[in-house]
């Protein structure tokens, strides 16, 4: 079965987006899949606004371990976060910046609590570049202006979801993996979502939703 058929039990694309927005408003996570012809992976996504140590611990335990903080381009500029490399030649042009750590309130920076502290420090609307040490254990990503209508990536999907939910435009993501370390695909992602009460949606769902409601996001 293809992705669309497997996801049909979660409703149509508009319903899937609305369920995800409700979950985020309630402080729960969602699972966002990209296209089967792209990465064909699913990311756990939480809002920074509601992020807890327990949620971070779940991400570290169940995912790849590379926890990323998705920020608007404007906020990343405010924090003076340069690209991780000068010449980004990755296949999907993922916009990693230098990694970060909070200067205050952390120990080694790698624990769930420390990563939450770093993330909330960086995403604070009044944050300054000097609040952060570089490098660190959190990996910021710059969302392209225009969101999923400009780039159909998990980074843009994360920031768009937060804005659509009326939350602070910052979220965390990490790629869901199987117990054997392989990447989770649609059937495993759906099973995980049911187990952890996380709605499942796709980036294509979000594109359809934004186009239907003509949402102009940053």
Curated annotation (Swiss-Prot):
GO terms for biological process: riboflavin biosynthetic process. Mg(2+) 2 binds at residues 39, 154. The keyword Repeat does not apply. Binds 2 divalent metal cations per subunit. Magnesium or manganese. GO terms for cellular component: cytosol. Its EC number is 4.1.99.12. D-ribulose 5-phosphate binds at residues 38-39, 43, 151-155, 175. Coiled coil: none annotated. GO terms for molecular function: 3,4-dihydroxy-2-butanone-4-phosphate synthase activity; magnesium ion binding; manganese ion binding. The record marks 137, 175 as: Essential for catalytic activity. InterPro entries: DHBP_synth_RibB-like_a/b_dom (IPR017945), DHBP_synthase_RibB (IPR000422). Pfam families: DHBP_synthase. Pathway: Cofactor biosynthesis; riboflavin biosynthesis; 2-hydroxy-3-oxobutyl phosphate from D-ribulose 5-phosphate: step 1/1. Its cofactor is Mg(2+); Mn(2+). It catalyses: D-ribulose 5-phosphate = (2S)-2-hydroxy-3-oxobutyl phosphate + formate + H(+). The keyword Manganese applies. Mg(2+) 1 binds at residue 39. HAMAP family: RibB. Homodimer. Belongs to the DHBP synthase family. Catalyzes the conversion of D-ribulose 5-phosphate to formate and 3,4-dihydroxy-2-butanone 4-phosphate. This is 3,4-dihydroxy-2-butanone 4-phosphate synthase. The gene is ribB.
